[in-house]
Amino acid sequence: MKIDSGIVGRESAPERVEVDKRWIMAYNAALGAVSATPHPLYPVCYEWNATRALRQATGLQNLNAQLVHAQHDLNVHRAPQAGETLTTLARVVAAEQRRPGAFVTIRLAARGAGGDAVSTTDYGMLYRAVHLEGGNRSLEKLEDPPRHAGELSKVGEVPVAATAAHVYTECARIWNPIHTDPEYARDAGLPGIILHGTATLAFSISTLMGALRPKTLRRVQCRFSGMVLMPSTLTVHASRQGDAIAFETRDERGEPVIERGWIG
């Protein structure tokens, strides 16, 4: 299996999505909250159509079984509002060969009706055991999440129900069968269905907000470093470092499933 680095620079057609109150509340409900305020990670919901359209346009959709969400870097310019229509443009901004496979980064830029920036996400995807042809390419300077400078303390736990991935799929309107279909997941080489990386991240952010109550949240960065099987209990560990909060989320064995996490 292979990916041609010539896909760098390819864009999707602009995807228009209406943000509605029901969707906002459903996403919060998937995370165990009753609220009509958009969750900081809600952008993953309205970005999904653009992500899928770009994968289809570039042929990456044919490699979905090899895809692992590996890295996330979200900048929130302003909160989305219920009732508005957002336009999201997806663009492949980098491709590089890594030891486990081909690493592809797409940039998702969402704007309001007046053209104002709402959110920008660099979404890193690892295609396991896939070879990159044409050499590494990059159109943008991309930032890896920095390493943590100090010790992290446990700030909370996240109980993950056996049904968490199914509920998150429907409430977020994000569907990939590795999260809901055991047979598909096993055929993809996984031990079973796994929780979405964005769900793990959203649960972690909710825990951090409840425990440490940051005054602002304009940026989220992390690496996804392990699979979350269900049911399970995750622990979130964090500390304030400068103006940001550093965090790591660990599984029941104490192994990180999110590392180099930052919110600020």
Model-derived features: positions:
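HotDog/MaoC-like acyl-thioester-processing domains
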Residues: 1-10, 69-157, 230-231, 235-264
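Hot-dog-fold acyl-thioester-processing enzymes
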Residues: 1-69, 132, 136-140, 145-214
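Small-side-chain structural scaffolding
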Residues: 28-30, 80, 101, 119-124, ...
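Small beta-barrel nucleic-acid-binding modules, principally OB-folds
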Residues: 64-78, 217, 225
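Catalytic-pocket segment enriched in acidic/His residues
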Residues: 179-257
